[in-house]
Each structure stands twice: as C-alpha cells, then as structure tokens.
Amino acid sequence: MQKIVLLNPKGGSGKTTIAINLASYFAVCGLKPTLMDLDAQGSTTRWLSKRAKGQSEIHGIAAYERNSRVTRSFATRVPLDTERLIVDTAAALETQQLPDITRNATAVLVPVLPSDIDIHAAAKCISNLLLVAKIRREEQRIAVIANRVKKNTLIYKALMRFLETLNIPVVATLRDSQNYIRVAESGQGLFEMKPNQVREDMEQWLPLIGWLAQRRPLDIPPGTPGITSGTTMNTLPAAQPAAAAAPAPIASTVMSPVVSAVATAAPAPASDETDPATVPPAAPTLG
C-alpha cells in the first residue's frame, strides 16, 4: 500500500483538489483507494457524497469527526485491501502533529501557489517536514506541486526560482483551470471526464503519476495499530481479503491514450510548463 499525504498548513493551496483527483485516478485504475479527510471543513467527504452510483469506488474516512464512543485509532482504520491511501490534511496544521500524520507515508506532496505569501509558507512547511517530522531528503519522500500557475508571469518565475533552491523534486506544474471546479462540483475527477474536455490538464498530471509509481509500497501486517499516531498503521478487515498482486495496469479502454501511457513511462520528467533548468532531478527508482 502507498500512503500519500497532501500537506501545506497554508489554506487554499489546493490540497483537496489534488487529493480528490488522485483518488479518482487510482479508482479508475482499479487500485482501491481510500480517501482520508482530516480537515474539519469536510471538503473531500462532501465530494465523495456527490459521487453517483456506478462510479469507480473510493472508500472514505471522515477522520475529522469526533466520536466519544470509539478511539481515534479505531475510527481511522483503513480497509485491508486498500492499495492507495490519500490523506487530505487541514489548514493551520500544528507543527507537533507532523510526525504522526506523515508516519509511514510513502509520499508527502506539498502544493505551492505562485504568491509571495504561499512561497514563504511552503518554505516553512518543508523545513518542518525535515526538522520536526524527521523526513530525510535522501529518502525522496517529499515532493512539491506548483499549483494554479500562469506561465510567463513574474510570480511564476519567482516561484520556480524558489523551488530550485529547495533541493526537493517538483513533480508537477498544474495550470489555473476551471476544469477542476467543474469536476469537483459533480463528484468526479479529471480522469473520469471525456479526454477531449480535459486533455491539457490530464497531461500535466503525468509527471506526478509517474513519480508516485516509483514509490516503494508499504508492507503493513494486518491489524497493526495507529494511522495518525503510534508507530504503524491501523487497518480494517477487507470484505474479501485480496492476495498480493502486481499493481493493476492502466486500462487503455477506460483511460485516455494520454494517461494510459503512464503505465510504461520512464521516470517522471518535468511538466511541459516547467523550465527543466529550474527543477531538481527526479527521484531515482526505489527497490
């Protein structure tokens, strides 16, 4: 299983948008995603409630809800057959919570908007991930997503100069697009739309998807405790225990040719909108 954490204590950076589109992508690929909502606003939970019957299944956990009758560890259990756990964190996240939330994460994605305030907040966030959460650079688990960018603007160039100094891979550059608003309102993701409607946006996700495909999955024994606290992950029994299998291929009959190409893609290059000279090299393949 992969645990992918979307994290940036600065509100409005696009964590939820990226989380729901990742979940829908994995669902269409048949990779059994679980979407955990840690934000009291419940945005990802509301998005899940809008999904129509017949859409690819995504298991949801409203982890922000408090229930005095059960422990937090019990309430945040993950189904055993989950292959991709996507964690959407809250804004104004307290620094001391970082070790618990990022524990066992195979990837921590930090969305950054092109503004001076967001650049400063991202620098602090990444510093805390390194110093407080104790995630080492050489583990190649932290990556940045340049979000809602408008190419050829001065602030975009300033953002890319800043990201160059981090020595953290920039795995996607996503444009400011109304398509994200439209799909969210209908409980869908980009990868569930007709390719000719969202092709440009889908193409910008390919480097991120390729980078995530290189992450080493977690090998977690059934029933081990704790997902946001403790030392290991807490899991729910699967409805039908699944035997270990190779990652499901991306079906060209379901996905567009643009996205199905990810199945055989080489290690992720920089996005088309990203100047390769400003982007740290992609992480090497693990395992």
Describe the role of every protein-language-model region.
Residues 1-7:
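Extreme N-terminal, non-catalytic leader segments
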Residues 16-20, 122-123:
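Motif I (Walker A/P-loop) of helicase-class P-loop NTPases
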Residues 216-287:
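P-loop NTP-binding site
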Residues 96-116:
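Inter-motif core of Ras-like GTPase G domains
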Residues 122-137, 147:
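Conserved C-terminal guanine-recognition region of P-loop GTPase G domains, centered on the G4
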Residues 182-201, 206:
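Inter-lobe coupling/hinge region of RecA-like P-loop helicase motors
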Residues 150, 160-191:
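Beta-strand-loop-alpha "switch" segments that mediate conformational coupling across diverse proteins
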Residues 7-13, 20-99, 103, 184-188:
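P-loop/Walker-type NTP enzyme "switch/lid" segment
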